């Protein structure tokens, strides 16, 4: 009986080593579970932080609407700048151009106005005197071409500009009249864009020749021209004489040589 009771007690009584081992295993299991929970919480926090960071980056990026708005504002600003530049260029082109003034070889001044009028003036002691205006009118409002001007000389020696289709006629009184030559229009003819009013009387300022001072100046001018022509003819005559003298000298030399040869021949024959 005692033996059986000991065996049962030995079987039912707990062993101290197994209890310690079970407690250690449970402690390790708790540590593993706590580590897994901490890792899961860290992973969840990392995922939340990365999602928040991506959301912040997307929030900081400009939207397509904002980009389109910026581009449209820059386009309107560029158009405004172009409009201002065009306004400035239009203001610059609307400035008036000064009237050009030309001077001929005789000292006469010619001014071409913007409306096509020719203003003729001769220089004087007190400035420009004797202003004459020649009105130029367009024969066709839609035709455009080139106007050809030519010189015409008045009775007092002044030169004026008239179109190429004008004829200048001097009357017995000394006045100058210009007449226009009109041509029948055809398909091959050039358009006549500038026409001078016909007839236009150009009265000379110094038509009277009774002034003794003017007569004296004319006489002196003619004398100077005659003296210049006389000197030119004298120079030509002297040059011609010099050439003739040179030719005669050459002939004289040849004759002297022939004479010497004849003398030698005669002396030889006489011996």
From Swiss-Prot:
Query: What is the protein name given in its UniProt record?
Result: Cyclic AMP-dependent transcription factor ATF-1
The chain residues annotated with the modification Phosphoserine are 63, 198
Q: Which organism is it from?
A: Homo sapiens
Describe the task this protein carries out. This protein binds the cAMP response element (CRE) (consensus: 5'-GTGACGT[AC][AG]-3'), a sequence present in many viral and cellular promoters. Binds to the Tax-responsive element (TRE) of HTLV-I. Mediates PKA-induced stimulation of CRE-reporter genes. Represses the expression of FTH1 and other antioxidant detoxification genes. Triggers cell proliferation and transformation.
> What's a Pfam family this protein contains?
pKID
Record-level GO BP terms: cAMP/PKA signal transduction; positive regulation of DNA replication; positive regulation of neuron projection development; positive regulation of transcription by RNA polymerase II; protein-containing complex assembly; regulation of transcription by RNA polymerase II; response to cobalt ion; response to purine-containing compound
Looking at the record, the residues that make up the bZIP domain are 213-271
Q: According to the entry, what is the taxonomic lineage of the organism?
A: Eukaryota, Metazoa, Chordata, Craniata, Vertebrata
List residue numbers at the site (Breakpoint for translocation to form chimeric FUS/ATF1 protein).
112
């Amino acid at each position: 009986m005692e033996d059986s009771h000991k065996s049962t007690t030995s079987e039912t009584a707990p062993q101290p080593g197994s209890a310690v081992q079970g407690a250690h295993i449970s402690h390790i299991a708790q540590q593993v579970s706590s580590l897994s929970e901490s890792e899961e919480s860290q992973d969840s926090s990392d995922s939340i932080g990365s999602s928040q960071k991506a959301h912040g980056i997307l929030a900081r990026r400009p939207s397509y609407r904002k980009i389109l708005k910026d581009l449209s504002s820059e386009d309107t600003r560029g158009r405004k700048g172009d409009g201002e530049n065009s306004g400035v260029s239009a203001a610059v082109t609307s400035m008036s151009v000064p009237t050009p003034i030309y001077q001929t070889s005789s000292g006469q001044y010619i001014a071409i106005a913007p409306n096509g009028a020719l203003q003729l003036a001769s220089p004087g002691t007190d400035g420009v005197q004797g202003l004459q205006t020649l009105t130029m009118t367009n024969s066709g409002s839609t035709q455009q071409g080139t106007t050809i001007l030519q010189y015409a000389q008045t009775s007092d020696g002044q030169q004026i500009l008239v179109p190429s289709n004008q004829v200048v006629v001097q009357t017995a009184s000394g006045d100058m009249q210009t007449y226009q030559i009109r041509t029948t229009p055809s398909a091959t003819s050039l358009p006549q864009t500038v026409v001078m009013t016909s007839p236009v009387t150009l009265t000379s300022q110094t038509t009277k020749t009774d002034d003794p001072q003017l007569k004296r100046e004319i006489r002196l001018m003619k004398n100077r021209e005659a003296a210049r022509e006389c000197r030119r003819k004298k120079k030509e005559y002297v040059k011609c004489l010099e050439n003739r003298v040179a030719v005669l000298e050459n002939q004289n030399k040849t004759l002297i040589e022939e004479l010497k040869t004849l003398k030698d021949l005669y002396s030889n024959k006489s011996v």
